[in-house]
Amino acid sequence: MLAQTFKKPHRAVLEQVSGTTVFIRNKRTKSKSSLSPLAQRVVTQLSVMSASRKQPKLLKLAREDLIKHQTIEKCWSIYQQQQRERRNLQLELQYKSIERSMNLLQELSPRLFEAANASEKGKRFPMEMKVPTDFPPNTLWHYNFRK
């Protein structure tokens, strides 16, 4: 019985072997109504172009649920804004501290200051060129970077 099943490789077959039902699924085939490669390419291009215009569906909420939703959204945006302000304040304080220490170094030892700010010959990728970020950049590389 199983030998007959394998003669039809492109179909799912339901067989009864010794009182039990066996479901055998084989290789899928393309449907006969598939588009030509040219038509498929056009469909793909149109779907890619329209992907940027697709908007999520508007929520249809009751009035109370809408008020709750808007309140939560507003609180979330305020929280995000506070986080950004905290982060910016911390970065500003770090920058001012670095600036003060560099000015102090310049006053105390101009020779050390020059050595600290000297460009290193043969260094292909300066650390100042890229900073660590949470997300990948829009432009992958700055080809015209000069120090």
Curated annotation (Swiss-Prot):
One of the GO BP terms on file: mitochondrial translation
This protein's encoding gene: MRPL28
Protein's UniProt keywords contain Ion transport: no
Chain's role: Component of the mitochondrial ribosome (mitoribosome), a dedicated translation machinery responsible for the synthesis of mitochondrial genome-encoded proteins, including at least some of the essential transmembrane subunits of the mitochondrial respiratory chain. The mitoribosomes are attached to the mitochondrial inner membrane and translation products are cotranslationally integrated into the membrane.
Name used for this protein in its record: Large ribosomal subunit protein mL40
Family to which this protein belongs: Belongs to the mitochondrion-specific ribosomal protein mL40 family.
PANTHER family noted in UniProt: 54S RIBOSOMAL PROTEIN L28, MITOCHONDRIAL, LARGE RIBOSOMAL SUBUNIT PROTEIN ML40
Coiled-coil features, chain-numbered ranges: none
Annotated organelle transit peptide span: 1-26
